[in-house]
Amino acid sequence: EIPYIFAETSLRNKSKNDAENNLIRSTLELSAAMIGGADAVFTNDFKIQNSDALSEEISFKQQIVLAYESIINVFDDAGNGSYYIENITQQFAEKSWKLFLEIEEAGGYCELLKSGTVQKKIYQHALEEQKWIEEGKLKLIGVNLYPKLEKTKSAEDLYSAKEIKKVRLAEMFE
């Protein structure tokens, strides 16, 4: 029996300063989920900050447009026959099975969770990934590549001659 697969768009790669690129990223994520055979998908609002009725509606309608206008949903296996997809899936399955066996040998997932091993591995990878962003090895348009630097506040809005305020340098762009 094939398990029921639920997919959700990620917030990890989104920027509060670049809703337009977030919309593109979430559309690609939805496409990947549908091509990958997800039974259900959920779209997070592409506006990380100050979401509104329109952004919620657009996020919802992304799924409908992809399903009915791209005809992805017509195929049982939209990626069938694609060498790249088949190859990467095989690699993923092999690495996953190896990791599964390592987890079992170490006493199982619950044991590794109790010992803090799972948390430590996630933390180490998160630091490594953040370093890739900082060094530009992993690029996010609008974040570390072609950042949106449109001012939304003036210096007069942020600072006052009458009082000393804590102000982050990036605040005028957010």
Set out the residue ranges of the language-model regions.
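Catalytic-core signal marking the mid-to-C-terminal active-site face
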Residues: 57, 61-174
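Glycine-rich and small/hydrophobic secondary-structure elements
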Residues: 21-35, 60-66
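Glycine-rich, charged/polar anion/phosphate-binding loops
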Residues: 25-29, 48, 127-128
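Alpha-helical transmembrane segments of multi-pass membrane proteins
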Residues: 7, 25, 117-121
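Histidine/acidic-residue-rich catalytic or RNA/ligand-binding cores of hydrolases
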Residues: 51-56
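Conserved phosphate-binding loops in nucleotide/dinucleotide-binding enzymes
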Residues: 14-24, 90
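Core alpha/beta catalytic barrel or barrel-like domain that forms the active/cofactor pocket
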Residues: 1-16, 31-49, 67-86
